[in-house]
């Protein structure tokens, strides 16, 4: 299992350039499969999830040229070669499920996707995806092996209301609807900035898509697609991650390309606990300004709320903030398990199955530990940790950097490769001492 040794008592200083958004890039690659036209994507992050998606597209028939130095991908899929996704792709992440929507136009007699993998943060049901596709006219068969979708008579526009504004379901239904006949209206849709980026991409390809402020997306199906050149938005999760690392280490980092308009809920909560930042034309500078004050309720939500991927690194900040703070995770029912690692380091965290908030969430009646109370500030001690998922991984690295002496062993670091371009190199250039397993003996 890949691992690193992270030394504590580290103050991070310098600048870092945020990469293109993981959650936009992978979906845009899938969207390129909608037609046989050429697509050029710029600002492409060199991360494992993108590499896996590129490999998946190639297996399906795409011709891909990736200039990693220039961060540019050119992709062209003259025809779809496979109707069944190889199982090795579904065990890594959840991207393959979007092929049900994206490929039904080109593979009307069926596309099969095996049971999915991804982060261990809860089941993340596909019910919203599948029911929405059925309303568009798709025939769905579910087995122990996976999901089979077909539309031998083609897809037809429909009115769809999602029970919950699921990001994945919204993306899947957009991809299916652009190839359907007539008009589709998706109500209670997710409108994260990555989804808006997908919509902009599809508009460039000739699609007629509009959105409004009440979470409604209107799509007119089209059979003619244009070639597209598109620059991917910066990754708001990576930007916030390095911002939190700056504050918790009592340092100062300028995060180049960070867009404050994509991060307003995060910046608001960061300011409320005393974290410092200043917005510039080409990025955001984050810095330690004064002792952090807790006593906040951190409640995750869909856009325009505080997104769930910011929650785990923010817990490290709360462990160093004076007072009692509450986390209420409303997006994924099993995303607080990583707190065991912080407790092992000395943090005071208590898990609860109840909704510790003025409002109840969809997990209020289940037996899910989705709320937590964190007391701070608490000195953290170096220890051995195993990363359970991508964002928890960055939280563990942040925590290890501020331990009082010693060094922490952190294993399963390939999780970080999924979502952070050159994360180790960036941290080292900011002053961190991060050693791979094969070089540790030099420093022991």
UniProtKB/Swiss-Prot annotation:
Protein residues bound to phosphoenolpyruvate: 22-23
Transmembrane segments: none
Domain of life: Bacteria
Involved pathway(s): Cell wall biogenesis; peptidoglycan biosynthesis
GO molecular function, one term: UDP-N-acetylglucosamine 1-carboxyvinyltransferase activity
InterPro entries xrefs: Enolpyruvate_Tfrase_dom (IPR001986), Enolpyruvate_Tfrase_sf (IPR036968), MurA_subfamily (IPR050068), RNA3'P_cycl/enolpyr_Trfase_a/b (IPR013792), UDP_GlcNAc_COvinyl_MurA (IPR005750)
Root EC class: transferase
Primary localization class, coarse: cytoplasm
Protein name: UDP-N-acetylglucosamine 1-carboxyvinyltransferase
Record organism: Chlamydia trachomatis serovar A (strain ATCC VR-571B / DSM 19440 / HAR-13)
Source species taxonomy: Bacteria, Pseudomonadati, Chlamydiota, Chlamydiia, Chlamydiales
């Amino acid at each position: 299992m890949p691992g690193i040794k992270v030394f504590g008592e580290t103050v991070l200083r310098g600048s870092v350039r945020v990469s293109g958004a993981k959650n936009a890039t992978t979906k845009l690659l899938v969207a390129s499969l909608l037609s046989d036209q050429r697509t050029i994507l710029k600002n492409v992050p060199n991360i494992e999830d993108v590499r896996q998606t590129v490999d998946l597209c190639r297996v399906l028939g795409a011709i891909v040229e990736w200039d990693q130095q220039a961060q540019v991908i050119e992709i062209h899929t003259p025809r779809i070669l496979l109707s069944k996704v190889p199982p090795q792709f579904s065990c890594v992440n959840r991207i393959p499920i979007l092929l049900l929507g994206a490929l039904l136009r080109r593979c009307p007699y069926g596309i099969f996707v095996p049971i999915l993998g991804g982060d261990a943060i809860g089941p993340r049901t596909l019910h919203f995806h599948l029911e929405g596709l059925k309303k568009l006219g798709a025939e769905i068969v579910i087995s122990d092996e996976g999901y089979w979708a077909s539309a031998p008579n083609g897809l037809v526009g429909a009115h769809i209301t999602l029970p919950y504004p699921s990001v994945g379901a919204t993306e899947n239904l957009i991809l299916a609807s652009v190839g359907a006949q007539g008009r589709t209206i998706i109500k209670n849709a997710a409108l994260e900035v990555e989804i808006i980026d997908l919509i902009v991409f599809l508009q460039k390809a000739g699609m007629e898509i509009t959105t409004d402020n009440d979470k409604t997306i209107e799509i007119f199906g089209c059979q003619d697609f244009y070639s597209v050149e598109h620059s991917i938005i910066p990754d708001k999760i990576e930007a916030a991650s390095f911002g939190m690392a700056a504050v918790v280490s009592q340092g100062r980092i300028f995060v180049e390309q960070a867009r404050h308009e994509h991060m307003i809920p995060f910046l608001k909560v960061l300011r409320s606990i005393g974290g410092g930042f200043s917005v510039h034309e080409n990025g955001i500078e984050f810095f330690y300004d004064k002792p952090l004050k807790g006593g906040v309720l951190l409640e995750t939500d869909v856009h325009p709320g505080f997104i769930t991927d910011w929650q785990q690194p923010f817990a490290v900040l709360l462990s160093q903030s004076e007072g009692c703070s509450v986390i209420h995770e409303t997006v994924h029912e099993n995303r607080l398990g990583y707190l065991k690692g912080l407790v092992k380091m000395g943090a005071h965290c208590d898990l609860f199955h109840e909704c510790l908030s003025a409002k109840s969430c969809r997990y209020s009646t289940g037996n899910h530990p989705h709320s937590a109370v964190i007391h701070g500030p608490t000195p953290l001690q170096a220890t051995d940790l195993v990363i359970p998922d991508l964002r928890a991984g960055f939280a563990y690295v942040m925590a290890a950097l501020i331990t009082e002496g010693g060094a922490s062993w952190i294993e399963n670091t390939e999780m970080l490769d999924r979502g952070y371009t050159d994360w180790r190199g960036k941290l080292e250039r900011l002053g961190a001492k991060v050693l791979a397993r094969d070089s540790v003996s030099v420093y022991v």
